[in-house]
Amino acid sequence: MKKVFTIIFWVLFAVGLILIVFFASKENNNAIAKKPDISIHVEGENAFLTESELLDRLIYKRLYQKNMKVNFVNVKKIEAAIIKMEEVKKVRAYKNIGNSWNIDVELRNPIARIFTLSQKAYYLDDEGFTMGRSLLHTAHVLVFSGFITEIMEKASVKEIINNDSLKSIRKLDDIYRISNYVCKDSLMNALIGQVYLEKNGDFILIPLVGKQTILFGSANSDEVVADKFNRLKVFYKEGMPHEGWEKYNTIIVKYEGQIVCRK
């Protein structure tokens, strides 16, 4: 008999626990959702989206409204909407116990600003993806201009390299190699401010200091780019202190194994 009472006790306990969880969950779903706790992370200093801007976009899309009940907060739809924003690299939205919920966002990190021949402006991020310009934010990054043809929106360097039909915008991968090197090298990052693409495909680097220009030439591989910048750094560290910043008008690293200076 004692064993029967024990079994009945635990059955009733389990049923009671299930009922408590059920009604607590039902009550929670009918509760008013708090404003989301939004966390935005970006490598570097160029953040193209703030917490308040993201919240405004969610409100505009009616994915979140003031006094919205918890059960109407659809985190999957919210994630799907946010990941489509071209500034966003990763997103995770989730509910907590009670009526609080979170949105964690990682933004793309722009490393170059590109102006095409028609004066359309794009950004290129550190993974080789293009981003449209922002009306609210400007990134302090390397600027590219010159004979740059149209760049399709949301193109990536990887897509261009692996797709023969995208050869018309092939220079995007060259732009990525130069900007990726410059942003990671403290000396070049402090020195180079602009890059101009000539009609013949040569890149011209324009320093922030001095009046000279740097004829860089092509940038068709990571090895070529690294070799040219290494030669340039040797010149700036060892030659420039003796020659002075104003002695030469043009520094040429276009040709393999050479540094040529012209007055």
Task: Tell me what each language-model feature is.
Residues 1-42, 51-53, 58-84, 89-263:
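Charged, solvent-exposed interaction patches on well-folded alpha/beta domains
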